[in-house]
Amino acid sequence: MAKIIRIKGEILGKDEPMVFTKEYNVVKEDDALETMYSEMGSKHAVKRAYIKIVEVSEISEEDVQNPILKKTLEMY
């Protein structure tokens, strides 16, 4: 069964830390982390060592803030 995972963190190594929140609909928490590392690393050109995870939590469909993920969940 799929879970909705919210990852909060920051990217270090730049002039000032960039704070982010990402939400993923995945089967395992590890899948969400791997996708987040891949996306953030390619978009911001940082290595995984510079991405600091602050919080990883499972959330309900009502708590989703990402509009694209919200629309996707409404379809099913």
UniProtKB/Swiss-Prot annotation:
<keyword id="KW-0694">RNA-binding</keyword>
<dbReference type="GO" id="GO:0003735">
    <property type="term" value="F:structural constituent of ribosome"/>
</dbReference>
<keyword id="KW-0699">rRNA-binding</keyword>
<dbReference type="GO" id="GO:0070180">
    <property type="term" value="F:large ribosomal subunit rRNA binding"/>
</dbReference>
<dbReference type="Pfam" id="PF01775">
    <property type="entry name" value="Ribosomal_L18A"/>
</dbReference>
<dbReference type="GO" id="GO:0006412">
    <property type="term" value="P:translation"/>
</dbReference>
<keyword id="KW-0689">Ribosomal protein</keyword>
<dbReference type="GO" id="GO:1990904">
    <property type="term" value="C:ribonucleoprotein complex"/>
</dbReference>
<keyword id="KW-0687">Ribonucleoprotein</keyword>
<comment type="similarity">
    <text>Belongs to the eukaryotic ribosomal protein eL20 family.</text>
</comment>
<protein>
    <recommendedName>
        <fullName>Large ribosomal subunit protein eL20</fullName>
    </recommendedName>
</protein>
<comment type="subunit">
    <text>Part of the 50S ribosomal subunit. Binds 23S rRNA.</text>
</comment>
<dbReference type="InterPro" id="IPR028877">
    <property type="entry name" value="Ribosomal_eL20"/>
</dbReference>
<dbReference type="GO" id="GO:0005840">
    <property type="term" value="C:ribosome"/>
</dbReference>
<dbReference type="InterPro" id="IPR023573">
    <property type="entry name" value="Ribosomal_eL20_dom"/>
</dbReference>
